[in-house]
């Protein structure tokens, strides 16, 4: 019996060392060698000012910008509280929130019907940090952004198309658009009116909490619908 107890104890210690030291080291080493930006946050600058991290979504609500996915991570896009809502598809509170988001989206996009509202725009990702939307979700917002900026829809669509990222190696993930990079490109095309750099986007929170290695790697490689 004592012998079995020591075997169990040794096995427990071995697993603790493996998963808390060796496994973490292997992930870190992989990120340093093969991960985007060596597993660190990809900082995005505009007019000499850091406006966010490309690996972590932000809450854009103005009509002149494209909107990303909702977030249930902390107060929103908090890498230290990465999570979804964990509410089931039949949860009444969840369904009411979806209806509210659909109504809000349609107020700003009256040219769309309820059936045309992109599902990803009203549903949060499992990480709560997703910085990407699909090209389809961006196209649905193009007219609203164009009208708000006084541009032609074709001009906005051209900027969107130039920011569509292909699947990794042509097979991993799907096509995606980084919302922050897209919005920065809009401002860069706005006769030097760098609007994002004037916004309080909570970058200090992002800077301090964007060391969530797993989320940064996954969001940098895949688009998770």
Please annotate each region the language model reported.
Residues 2-19:
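Aromatic-residue-lined binding/catalytic grooves and analogous aromatic/hydrophobic interfacial grooves
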Residues 3, 96, 100-103, 158, ...:
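Solvent-exposed alpha-helical segments within well-ordered globular domains of core cellular machineries
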Residues 7, 20, 27-148, 164-167:
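Flexible, solvent-exposed loop/hinge segments and secondary-structure transition points
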Residues 140, 144-199, 203-205, 217, ...:
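Extracytoplasmic/periplasmic C-terminal soluble domains
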Residues 211, 215-216:
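Targeting/processing segments of secretory and organellar proteins
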Residues 221:
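Short acidic/glycine-rich loops and adjacent helix/strand connectors
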